Amino acid sequence: MATRFPKFSQGLSKDPTTRRIWYGIATAHDFESHDGITEEKLYQKIFASHFGQLAVIFLWTSGNLFHVAWQGNFEQWVQDPLHVRPIAHAIWDPHFGQPAVEAFTRGGASGPVNIAYSGVYQWWFTIGMRTNLDLYRGALFLLFLSTLALLAGWLHLQPKWKPSVSWFKNAESRLNHHLSGLFGVSSLAWSGHLVHVAIPEARGQHVRWDNFLTSIPHPQGLQPFFTGNWSIYAQDPDSMNHLFGTSEGAGTAILTFLGGFHPQTQSLWLTDIAHHHLAIAILFIVAGHMYRTNFGIGHSIKEILEAHTPPGGRLGRGHNGLYDTLNNSLHFQLGLALASLGVITSLVAQHMYSLPAYAFIAQDFTTQAALYTHHQYIAGFIMVGAFAHGAIFFIRDYNPEENKENVLARMLEHKEAIISHLSWASLFLGFHTLGLYVHNDVMQAFGTPEKQILIEPVFAQWIQATHGKTLYGFDVLLSSNQSPALNAGANLWLPGWLDAINNGNNSLFLTIGPGDFLVHHAIALGLHTTTLILVKGALDARGSKLMPDKKEFGYSFPCDGPGRGGTCDISAWDAFYLAVFWMLNTIGWVTFYWHWKHITLWQGNVSQFNESSTYLMGWLRDYLWLNSSQLINGYNPLGMNSLSVWAWMFLFGHLIWATGFMFLISWRGYWQELIETLAWAHERTPLANLIRWKDKPVALSIVQARLVGLSHFSVGYIFTYAAFLIASTSAKFG
């Protein structure tokens, strides 16, 4: 007899209802709960799945390169990056009528195409690619890597090649290899690529495999390196008149510390980027020799944690027991990794627009908006996941005996103080920010805008001034001519930095006023409330005053309202569920702010943002409503244009989003009755009754319905805003 899905759970596979399918999908990746799982099998499965993940990533990037080379216009774009619209791929759609075919035939293409707003053209151009052949070679190489990763994954599941648990728990070796090998050597390799291929290409010198070994990246070769005259590599940088991709105005420097942006491309100097990666490489390669492994030298993390006695005994037993707690809990490790990755992803969003690294990307406004929004949403989901796995750690892996009186136990002991402080901060931010906005709305409505409460963000302006922004007249540190900081570092403070920070043509330290002050605090409210929900969910996951320890209840123990008595207090799943809504709303405010401020900057009417962002009606009317007009006219009774696909996605996104509420605000018995009625009708309808099912239809559980509702809400919300963002920006700037 064939085993029914799911094979990993015999108990579940025998369930006669549709619950078998839903629970099977829900627990497919919860390896810990599978039949016959051992610690060794668990680690090996996760290890092998990492190779699968790499294979998918390589295949995806290979596909990007291949489709652009096959159906894109990379070679035409390279000739004129500012005026040719980059093509992602062709659209094959038999449903298109003639008006649609004409509307979507752009960028010099012969048929309907999709425009690329991902920035890949600018990236490939910056790193030295120039022809379709370059793209094809890249695609083929990545396809080879993808196959290699799949083979490695399969190999490490074979008996002879399965690593042991002790190998996975050798933290020092893993840290050394990841620091030196993963970060250090890869940064060194990237610096090498920039110096040997990308920088020469930016100066009109074509370096490929046939002349790679004969083209010296610097006229003096390695002599300055071996003689210690490293500064020679920084002499003669590209001039301010350098035309990117040509020898006109090009210098010979390969590792510089200029600061600021290349005047033509509006992106960071490639020689600065190469220098940065070389410095990172050295730092990480050194760091990767820090921990004790084979030779009995270096640090032992366990010894460090146990030797560190907190001053005055104020933190109990400090970090005692933490090494084993962390090293034996995959959820703890994953939580920390996700928290780090979430922060980094958000920083990537901030730096991609303020310090653009890719040539001409700063002038492609739709791409800038898309990349910022994309990275902020990704960061939000990753951060929420960090807390979810932190909560699972407390439920499944935390052992109070092993952590007596250490910092982890003490944090749990004063969780009430942590939660109440976060609660107070959220309440303070919420009432004051909303109060200011609403007051300003009322003043606008009554025709007395001069009575608005407008607060200048003086502390933030002062911080901008210390970094060199002179506009506010603070005359402090780098913005002061007499400052010892400025004089002492005349050649150190990246000569181009001070020009860039005071130049109105980039997004570096944007000028801020009362509208920024208010939205900053609205975002702070969102961040603090999301954090409050997540922190409370994790700290109370194992129990509260009402229910001391719920280890056996598991993570997806549902909160069922006051009728069940106190279960909402200790449901980490429900905290996660609630936090996702707050996270999405917070990132909504972040992206609204970024987008509106930049639209007005790019259009040269920044006063619109400054005047309208101080009250809520301004946001609704002058940002959302005003910018959705082009979108809603994607197709109308007079015909259609290239925005029609975004108009359709905008409507469809709203539909998915609204469907979520059907699952979120409903009574479970109603669904069961509805399903039974549909099943009854199906079985009695000719033709339809030829199709039978073996599983008895059962309504979703509370947790499942919340998950389905939440996923619809999230996907619909993001679809809707993505369509709005891309259509409103591309309609204005192309």
UniProtKB/Swiss-Prot annotation:
Positions binding chlorophyll a B1 in this chain are H654
One cellular component term from this protein's GO annotations in UniProt: photosystem I
Q: Which Gene3D superfamilies match?
A: Photosystem I PsaA/PsaB
Q: In which domain of life is the source organism classified?
A: Eukaryota
Q: Which UniProt keywords apply?
A: 4Fe-4S, Chlorophyll, Chloroplast, Chromophore, Electron transport, Iron, Iron-sulfur, Magnesium, Membrane, Metal-binding, Oxidoreductase, Photosynthesis, Photosystem I, Plastid, Thylakoid, Transmembrane, Transmembrane helix, Transport
| Membrane topology, record value | Multi-pass membrane protein
Q: Where is phylloquinone annotated to bind?
A: W671
- List all membrane-crossing ranges: 46-69, 135-158, 175-199, 273-291, 330-353, 369-395, 417-439, 517-535, 575-596, 643-665, 707-727
> Biological process GO annotation list?
photosynthesis
As to how many cofactors bind and how, the note says: P700 is a chlorophyll a/chlorophyll a' dimer, A0 is one or more chlorophyll a, A1 is one or both phylloquinones and FX is a shared 4Fe-4S iron-sulfur center.
Q: Where in the cell is it found?
A: Plastid, Chloroplast thylakoid membrane
Q: Which family does it belong to?
A: Belongs to the PsaA/PsaB family.
Described by its record, this protein's role is as follows: PsaA and PsaB bind P700, the primary electron donor of photosystem I (PSI), as well as the electron acceptors A0, A1 and FX. PSI is a plastocyanin-ferredoxin oxidoreductase, converting photonic excitation into a charge separation, which transfers an electron from the donor P700 chlorophyll pair to the spectroscopically characterized acceptors A0, A1, FX, FA and FB in turn. Oxidized P700 is reduced on the lumenal side of the thylakoid membrane by plastocyanin.
Instruction: Identify the NCBIfam families for this entry.
Output: psaB
**What does the subunit comment say?**
The PsaA/B heterodimer binds the P700 chlorophyll special pair and subsequent electron acceptors. PSI consists of a core antenna complex that captures photons, and an electron transfer chain that converts photonic excitation into a charge separation. The eukaryotic PSI reaction center is composed of at least 11 subunits.
Question: What name is this protein filed under?
Answer: Photosystem I P700 chlorophyll a apoprotein A2
